[in-house]
Amino acid sequence: MASARDIRRRIRGVRNMQQITKAMKMVAASKLRKAQEKVIAARPYARQLQEVLARLAQDQADVTHPLLMERPVQRVGYIIITSDRGLCGGYNTNLIRMTNSSIAEETHDVRLVAVGRKGRDFYRRGKIETIAEFVGLGDNPSYGQAKEIAQEVIGLYESGELDEVYLLYNEFVSAISQRPTRIKLLPIEKPKQVSNTEYIFEPSAEEILTTLLPKYVETQVFRTLLEGKASEMGAKMTAMGAATDNAKEAIERLTLQLNRARQAAITTEISEIVGGASALE
């Protein structure tokens, strides 16, 4: 059995760690609320933009644009959105597992656009070519950052470096649930159903379509960045909460061991005293 001194030292260490994980949980909870608000605000905008784009594409069926044109697929691009830091449970692991499954099932050459250090570092050790990297986006992704990623990907697509592009990210479901998701980004698919809402376009539907298509790509990237950040904070809050609870249980077990060690020491001391007294008789 460990000595009482060793057990006390372990209790202090676990208690210090518990304070850290508790603080990290509170910080993650605060950031989660802000990230969740942004996700909720971004989703309707993305849906409405998609609806307008669908109406335009339907009304201007003869309009050709590089982002709408399908071509024979040889190289597929995966934009994988992971975190820059760890301590967020299975957030990165689950997404990378889904990405690996998609790569294994893919019949074409796959190239990665890594967003976040965790994904970048993981695939640097593998055999999948990473053609672009974006790290250090912080806890508050901006539209400017999303635009930079989108323009890079659009350039790769229009140059023929990529023939299809997919976004792989964690969709935010709730604070305790994140869903690894894959959606097609390029070429932009025309929705099968559109609303009956009538739109009046100025100066012309064709000019607006040309402007909206890149904007749509930027918006989708921005939305998925926000989804990923909210998911990351939810996963981190859950992980740190579990770590705090585990620390509490460990302290309780160590305290019980300490009490037993004290009791054993007292019993031994009493036995020695009684034994010494008996020897003097």
Swiss-Prot record:
It comes from the Bacteria. It is a peripheral membrane protein. Coiled coil: none annotated. SUPFAM superfamilies: ATP synthase (F1-ATPase), gamma subunit (SSF52943). It is found in: Cell membrane. CDD domains: F1-ATPase_gamma (cd12151). One of its GO terms (biological process) is proton motive force-driven plasma membrane ATP synthesis. Transmembrane segments: none annotated. Keywords: ATP synthesis, Cell membrane, CF(1), Hydrogen ion transport, Ion transport, Membrane, Transport. GO terms for molecular function: ATP binding; proton-transporting ATP synthase activity, rotational mechanism. The keyword Ion transport applies. One of its GO terms (cellular component) is proton-transporting ATP synthase complex. The keyword Transport applies. Pfam families: ATP-synt (PF00231). Belongs to the ATPase gamma chain family. Produces ATP from ADP in the presence of a proton gradient across the membrane. The gamma chain is believed to be important in regulating ATPase activity and the flow of protons through the CF(0) complex. F-type ATPases have 2 components, CF(1) - the catalytic core - and CF(0) - the membrane proton channel. CF(1) has five subunits: alpha(3), beta(3), gamma(1), delta(1), epsilon(1). CF(0) has three main subunits: a, b and c. PANTHER family: ATP SYNTHASE GAMMA CHAIN, ATP SYNTHASE SUBUNIT GAMMA, MITOCHONDRIAL. HAMAP family: ATP_synth_gamma_bact (MF_00815). This is ATP synthase gamma chain. It comes from Desulfitobacterium hafniense (strain DSM 10664 / DCB-2). The lineage of its organism: Bacteria, Bacillati, Bacillota, Clostridia, Eubacteriales.
